[in-house]
Each structure stands twice: as C-alpha cells, then as structure tokens.
Amino acid sequence: MIIFCTPLSEYEKIILKINNYLLPKTIITDVGSSKERSIELIRKILKKGISWTSSHPIAGSEVSGPEHGKKNLFLNKWCILIKEKNTNKKHIEVLSKFWKKVGSRVAIMDSKKHDTVFSMTSHLPHLIAYNLVKTATDFEKQQRYEL
C-alpha cells in the first residue's frame, strides 16, 4: 500500500518516479481534501492497469508535521473513500478495513459529491473566516488613518 501524504502539487513528480515499479495489485491512495482535480491529474499520468483509490480522513488540526502527530488521530473520525466507475472494489475493501483498523468510521462517495460536500462544510467556512479577519484588519488600519 502506498499513501500519498503530500501536497497535490507533488503528486505528479512522485508518480513519475514510481510508475515503473507499480503493480496492478498495488493499493495507492492519498489523504488530500480535493478529489476531482487530483483524480483527473492522476488518471492522465498513472501507468495503464494501475488503480488509484482516493481517501480523505477528516482528522487533523491547523498544525502539520510529524512533531504534531497524535496516537489516536483517526479515532472516531470519518474517512471518506472515493469510489468511481472504474475503482477497484477489492482496493475499496482493503482501504475500508485499514481505516477502520486505525479507528476511523468509513463512508463511500464519488469525487463530485465529496468535493461539493466539503466545499460547503469545510472550505467555505475557511474562506469566510479569512475574509472576516482581513475585513477587521483593514477596518483597524482605516480607523488608525482617520485618527
């Protein structure tokens, strides 16, 4: 099993380095939060006959890196597995068992539904929060200027 835990911008570089070593039985997944775009990119460059089954564990925090690792990071957290028309069913089964073994609850959906759901529940609130902070900062600067 290979789990991509890197930024999406690194996927292509990594796949091109490992492509010749991949076997049809190799289970490849990722833990990114954007699925449609990543799956589209991966399909274009992944060697024929190799299956990619995307995962999205809904766990973590605002900090990253191994120094912030937690023993029970996935305990009782959702992990979304992405199932498309050509997804290898055996890989879905193995990944489902894997994520459950580390404590996750597993749900399965297609990439379009995933990205729609998470753009509204995760990405949109972040965008609103960033804009709120910027508006407050700009307002504070304007108030200083007027004083």
Go through the PLM ranges and name each one.
Residues 71-147:
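Internal alpha-helical scaffold of NAD(P)-dependent oxidoreductase catalytic cores
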Residues 14-66:
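Rossmann-like NAD(P)(H) cofactor-binding subdomain of soluble oxidoreductases
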Residues 3-5, 59-60:
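Short acidic/polar alpha-helix capping motifs at helix-coil junctions
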Residues 5-7, 32, 83:
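Glycine-rich, N-terminal phosphate-binding loop of Rossmann-like dinucleotide-binding domains
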Residues 1-3, 29:
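N-terminal Rossmann-like NAD(P) cofactor-binding module of classical short-chain dehydrogenase/reductase
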